[in-house]
From Swiss-Prot:
The protein's Enzyme Commission number: 1.11.1.-
Family the UniProt entry places it in: Belongs to the AB hydrolase superfamily. Bacterial non-heme haloperoxidase / perhydrolase family.
Keywords: Chloride, Oxidoreductase, Peroxidase
Name of the protein described by the UniProt record: Putative non-heme chloroperoxidase
Source species of the chain: Synechocystis sp. (strain ATCC 27184 / PCC 6803 / Kazusa)
Amino acid sequence: MPYVTVGQENSATIDIYYEDLGAGQPIVLIHGFPLNGDSWEKQVLVLLNAGYRVITYDRRGFGASSQPSSGYDYDTFAADLHTLMTKLDLQNTVLVGFSMGTGEVTRYLGKYGSERVQKAVLMAPVPPFLLKTNDNPEGVDQSVFDGIMKAIVDDRPAYFSAFFKEFFNVDVLLGERISNEAIQASWNVAAGASAKGTLDCVPSWLTDFRDDLPRIDVPTLIIHGDADRILPLESTAARLPKRIKNSQLEIIPGGPHAINWTHADQVNPLLLNFLQ
């Protein structure tokens, strides 16, 4: 199993698990919370068939990567991505983030620039800024995130069960675009994640990306479902085209948060067309 070492805690190294498949222009897929690189299954198959080199990796604390007690912030997440990009010497890369993974894409480009990056894709994005403040009235009250953290501490497995119902819009899409088996598979991955990492990721969602967005200087595709209950369109993606030059927003009608799974039949053609 391939790993890249990104740090050390006490006597143990902090290692990021990745998969590097195929040949051609590199596409780096960055997963959402609380999943791992396997959540890109429906995109990996299509991208490999289209002749791309596809790299997935597990964020620290999740999947097969190390589960350290710290580093669950976007400066560290972006540094982990930078280490991977440097080790693999990726050039002309397309960075594709889903949900929490869009934070890595945004902070990476804001901090490290686009020397290694040709294009970017933000699916169901976290940016620009989730927290409601005086200068960000479109955000969400802090009390909502406090409630999430309490639910994780009280009963993390039960929190995941409730989370995935809204993640996939189960009440509407079960049996049509999502199966019980797929939901259970996602729950299993989430349950295996770091308890500390799961909790510490919540404050990271409140990162203010507004200064990073104008620094994105590559063509950027934004995709969002108009029925997203986790990150509503109006608070997130709808605010990005004015902040990212050379960007385009594509809206998936009826799409929940997990559009890369439930609406892969619509997401994948948009992705392939943008890559060409």
